[in-house]
């Protein structure tokens, strides 16, 4: 049938020429420095969906930097007790990244965490739906920085579970931060493609 190649072309064009909102991942940048009051207070929370990315941007300065010196620190994943105490000494704490290049050329150092259930990489981290994960930073001895904290809530909890709304990190006018909430509804284009696939199979039979 002449309609079959045309329909196949339309489907591939839609898949390749579109980001398919609701079917693709989003990136969530967090500028990790002590000018962010929510990271300082420890009430910063972001909600992420699977296949989203958490992008951590380290402090970055033009030479010679601030008079008090540049912020440098190590970032850790910890449990709740480590998060409350802002310490990385617990048995479940481990270092995730190291922000040690405040004068990196061209742009700040960025570390990316992909929210995924399984990872093929030995240094990757595997997340569970409905769980909350805790990040803290510990300043190096020569750094003027302070302990910063972030909670990452992974969508979604099991049906019937209570869910407290999380506060996004950053808002208009808040210094150096931005954040979004996860849990993305499928886009109309994505749903349309899913509906057309059975029709395509039927046309191949005919």
Swiss-Prot record:
GO terms for cellular component: plasma membrane; side of membrane. GO terms for molecular function: ephrin receptor binding. Disulfide bonds join 58-99, 86-147. The keyword Metal-binding does not apply. InterPro entries: Cupredoxin (IPR008972), Ephrin (IPR031328), Ephrin-A_Ecto (IPR034252), Ephrin_CS (IPR019765), Ephrin_RBD (IPR001799). Keywords: Cell membrane, Disulfide bond, Glycoprotein, GPI-anchor, Lipoprotein, Membrane, Signal. Glycans are attached at residues 33, 98. Residues 161-180 are annotated as: Disordered. Belongs to the ephrin family. This is Ephrin-A4. It comes from Mus musculus.
């Amino acid at each position: 049938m002449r309609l079959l190649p045309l329909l196949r072309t339309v489907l591939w064009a839609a898949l390749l020429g579109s980001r398919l909102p609701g079917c693709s991942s989003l990136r969530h940048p967090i500028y990790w420095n002590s000018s962010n009051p929510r990271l300082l207070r420890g009430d910063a929370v972001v909600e992420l969906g699977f296949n989203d990315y958490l992008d951590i941007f380290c402090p970055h300065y033009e030479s010679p930097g601030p008079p008090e010196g540049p912020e440098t620190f190590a970032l850790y994943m910890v449990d709740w007790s480590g998060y409350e105490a802002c310490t990385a000494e617990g048995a479940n704490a481990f270092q995730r990244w190291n922000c040690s290049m405040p004068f990196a050329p061209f742009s700040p150092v960025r570390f990316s965490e992909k929210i995924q259930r399984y990872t093929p990489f030995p240094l990757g981290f595997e997340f569970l739906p409905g769980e909350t994960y805790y990040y803290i930073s510990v300043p190096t001895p020569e750094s003027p920085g302070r302990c910063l904290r972030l909670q990452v809530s992974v969508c979604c909890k099991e049906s019937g579970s209570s869910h407290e709304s999380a506060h996004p990190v950053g808002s208009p006018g808040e210094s150096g931060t931005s954040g979004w909430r996860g849990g993305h509804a499928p886009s109309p284009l994505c749903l349309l493609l899913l509906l057309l696939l059975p029709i395509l199979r039927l046309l191949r039979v005919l």
